[in-house]
């Protein structure tokens, strides 16, 4: 592939505020002494301009926490200052498509090594790049992978994740998935810490990217993806996890096996389990401290995730357990089969789990005195 790599220094943009001084509408010029007085009495610093967009993912390591957004770049949490720090202020207008961060991961052995998968179908020539930082986002290197995969970080399914992962046993090995591919596979890998990338042809031979579409729609640039149009469900690879020498890859398709596993470095991908659903799509895979996979499913990528499930899979024993949360109605407990955004484990206790629904609209039923006004909160549920 033609690989573009750039070293980028993260600079903070400064905003200069100008204040007019006058009396009764009459402009009065400032003398040198007045200007000196103002300069000495003011504190001058950069203006903090907060980012925007949908926060589509948060990842944590031992010491660092990062967030990604669909149009506002990526952030690192400053625990001392108790604020989020923008990491992508170096991007210019021509590269604004990279503010759509489709996926991210850290090296499990080093929180300061961060990878961001970025791209937007309708900005910056629909280019896709992986940004690598080895200093917690202070500086980045850009590796262009457009000729292998393409992503739309502001597209449907962007809440799924993460579609990039580092092998904890060998951090030079990284797997990354796209929404679309102009090459032979929607899954790529690096064996040199992200310097170079190649297609994983074994995944490509599964023929999960079966539709050929124009990307973007107003061009003649042909790609293969998992849906008939990019703005309705072309989410491609939704989630990747690497553990115990195996790579697990979830794909946003229905009607066939959509969660596959292979030995790291192998092209022999197989369905993980016949017991897993095929009429829903994997949304996220997390690990508990015992090495079990916590897998969640959704039925839609847009504003209603529909039905779904949650599972725990033991890769050592191949045991699969349905851990979908339950609700109680009229004294009877039943599975709440709605779309789930993820199940997360306490880093030190695999028995402590938190599950969250995805794109559901529930009354939270908090008591009125828990809020500033007498109203009911609406949103997703936590278990």
Regions flagged by a language model, labelled:
Residues 21-22, 281:
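Intrinsic disorder/low-complexity segments in short proteins, especially the signal peptide
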Residues 12-21:
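Hydrophobic core
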Residues 1-11:
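Bacterial Sec-dependent N-terminal signal peptides
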Residues 28-383:
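Extracellular glycan-interacting surfaces
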Residues 23-27:
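Juxtamembrane cytosolic interface motif at the C-terminal end of transmembrane helices
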Residues 11-12, 138:
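A periodicity- and composition-biased signal for non-globular, repetitive helical segments
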